[in-house]
Amino acid sequence: MATKLFVNLPVKDLNRSKAFFTGLGLTFFGQAEDMASVIISEHTQVMLLTNTVFASYARNGVVDATAGTEAILVLGVETRDQVDQLADRAEEAGGSPVGTPRDDGYRYQRGFTDLDGHHWEALCLIDPAG
């Protein structure tokens, strides 16, 4: 059984992408001139790969995330305030909001794109029992 998750994302400008994720309050584990690993949690990392490196792994080309959504990456947090803080930091770091906040009683979430157009959501699940 797998115990860790590594999500690989292509980026056009690695230094700009590193600055964006640093702006979200995230840190890195391992960096090279063509890749950097963003620590999401103890068991999850997002590997930022330059388009050239990503293409060397991809079986059928690199998708332009600004032209279509290849995935929605969801970051789970504990509170509504943390959802707002993360989404606000993303916008301050140069990302763009996606849609409007969703609040349906059992979850609260806000979406944003990073500098390469990858779609992210900050999500808090709300216990209906309080």
Describe the function of each predicted region.
Residues 8-55:
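Core segments of cupin and vicinal oxygen chelate
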Residues 23, 27-28, 32, 65, ...:
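Charge-dense, helix-prone N-terminal extensions
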Residues 67-99:
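Mid-chain, well-packed structural core segment of small domains
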